[in-house]
Amino acid sequence: WFPANLCLSVNDCVVHWIPDKYVLKNWDVLKIDCGVNYNKWISDAAVSLVVWWELANPLGQALIVATKSALDRSLEYIHNWNSAYEYSRNVLTVMKNAWFSVLEKLTWHWVGNYVHEKPHIYNVPDSSMKKVQLKSWMVIALEPITAVKSRDFFCNEGNWRNLYTEYWDLWAQWEYTVLVTDDGYEILAGLETL
């Protein structure tokens, strides 16, 4: 059970911040993560942005652009019979080349009648992921979750929903719900332009 359809996480809060009375300020990095249940089928999508983009800090902008690029450039590895490892390996490579980190213990996942269906696949690859093969008609939520420096996170004040970067640095996320097809993929949900 989750208490909201919309999570609005700000600055160093990585995921799952439920909207409250916080007033956004110029230069805040905001992640909007939304799940939709339509006829008992779930879609999940997220986007990151900097409040007042034109005046924003260049570090936040660069992190967001790199994160979206990691997702978009890794989509070529989403196709029938490819392993989950290849997608995650490419996400990590793109982020390292941009001098940013990937939060190691957060995952992308299958979706269907529930928002987080198994298996959950880490954005940082390990050899066990080579056994997880993508197959046509699988629906997956691809979501690189990145940070300026942090690779880990913690729960603040015992609240399992609000996860914060280990160094209190900026983070970003971009997420698509994707259908695996015989010859590639189809994006079902998610903002494709920056």
Description of each model-found segment:
Residues 1-194:
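Active-site neighborhoods and metal-handling regions in enzymes and metal-associated proteins
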